[in-house]
Structure formats: C-alpha cells, structure tokens
Amino acid sequence: MNEDNESHLVPGRECGECTACCVHLLIKDDEFEKPADQACSHMVEKGGCKIYNDRPSVCQDWHCAWRFMPQLTDEWRPDRSGILLRSDENGIIFQPIREPKKAMTSSLAIELIGGGIAQGIPLSMSIPTRKGYLSHGMSLNEPLQEVVESRSLPAIQNKLIDLIKFSKKQKTDSIIATDS
C-alpha cells in the first residue's frame, strides 16, 4: 500500500475490530463491487480483511471521517457511535449503522451536527429506507438551522426524528441492479 494513502490519518487511530465500512458501504468500482448492508466476502469474523495487503484500491484509499478528523473522539469510531461518518466534496455525511433515531439524536451526534451547522459546514444524512433499497440522502443545514440556533436539545432531537421519518418513507432505487 502506498504510504501517501495514510499520510492524512490521525496517528495511532486504527480501525481495530470496526467493520462498518466493510459491511455498510455500497461499493461500485471497476475493480470491486459490494452491496450496501452486506458483509464483504473478504471480511474475517472479528474484523479485518483476509486480503488486506492485496485489497482493492477503492478499499485502500477510503477511510471514514473518524480516521482523519482529529477533533473526533474515540467515541466516534463507527462501531461505538453507531454512525459511519463519511466526507466528500459536498461536506460530511452522517450514515447511521444502527437504529437511526437513537444514533442521530444522541448527544454525541447533536453536538457535532449543531457545531457543524453553526460553522456553516455542509452536513447531510443517509437514512435507510427499506431492506434491499438505497438509503435516502438529505441535507441537514437548512432544515435544522432554526432549531440549532434555538439551542434547544429537545427541539433539535424532534426535528431530526421528523427528518428521519421523512427519509424512511422515500422511494429509492433497488440496491440490486435489474435488467430492463
């Protein structure tokens, strides 16, 4: 593996037994594909990868936000927080990997969401709709701006629950491609 792929990571922060990306991510790459919410065929039982040294470049190059954002505490490791934090050109994405209402309304999540919105950092969430279908993505900044400014924890939690309920009802595409 090229050391440049890990030069931006927080020193000493390792995945350990966390396998959130190996299970929950949808991977569609020329070199490798894996459905969302299914364990990768190369994953070992207690975490880790059978082909770690030869794993596809898409796996070598990707890291959750916990691995490269030093301001995130150890509680933010996905298997501990219940949220896989991703980052892309559009900002930070909260992808709950456990019960979305519980994970997204935790004080840990609300502190980061509130701080991000207050600083103008684009935030979104990716909420599962139904088994076998893609998650629904939704921006958090505009719908949460007013309640974040109110600094009312119950108001923020209630608004997040409303947004999660809305997302869960959305029609999304099947994870499995169908021939037309």
Locations of the language-model features?
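Short loop/turn segments that flank or connect secondary-structure elements
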Residues: 1-180
